[in-house]
Design a protein with these regions (language model features):
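Elongated, amphipathic alpha-helical interaction scaffolds
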Residues: 1-184
Length: 186
């Protein structure tokens, strides 16, 4: 996947289409070179029964409405992936990855082809084949030691951000002390 653009407006992308509807704040919103949209969400709590699957439905609707201008044909809707990275097994089946697309109940091999895919990654899962980087990423999310280059880069980035936050706190403490001394005329 070649990424064209990653949006981090104020950490989350907001979609607020109507005054009388609920707004959506997306954790990470990515568009690749083919125009495919990826919405990636981190989930540490299950919420009420059925909440997360229904939230993917709502996010899908809001993303589609945001992408589809008035007068544009429906076949211009882009492929979208809504990905929930979960620190728990939402479905209780011990799979590492659960991928959902709309299928015909009477003919399960018949896919609707609406371009919408929902993926739930399970950091606790042990079943199902995934590539090494994804396996290590899920271990990383679960707080386990991961060996891949990607996981090591993520760990280094987390440490860098932690150091940056510590430096920011130290700077603010020094600055506040300076302000206090300045006011006291020292």
């Amino acid at each position: 996947v070649r990424i064209r653009d990653i949006h981090y407006p104020d950490t989350e992308k907001s979609i607020d289409l109507r005054l009388d509807s609920k707004a959506v704040r997306l954790d990470v919103y990515i568009e690749d070179d083919a125009g495919t949209v990826y919405n990636i969400e981190m989930q540490t709590t299950k919420g009420r029964d059925g909440e997360l699957p229904r939230r993917t439905r709502y996010y899908q609707c809001m993303i589609d409405m945001d992408l589809l201008d008035k007068g544009v044909y429906y076949d211009d809707l882009r492929q979208t992936y809504i990905i929930f990275i979960c620190t728990f097994d939402l479905f209780g089946r011990d799979e590492r990855i659960y991928t959902f697309r709309h299928r015909c109940i009477e003919l399960p091999e018949l896919e609707l082809g609406d371009g919408a895919t929902k993926i739930f990654l399970n950091a606790k899962g042990l079943r199902g084949r995934v590539d090494r980087d994804l396996e290590d990423f899920l271990k990383f999310v679960d707080g386990q030691k991961a060996q891949s280059e990607l996981a090591q880069e993520m760990e280094q980035e987390v440490e860098r951000v932690k150091r940056q936050d510590e430096m920011r706190r130290e700077y603010m403490t020094l600055y506040m002390e300076y302000q206090k001394q300045h006011r006291a005329g020292i």
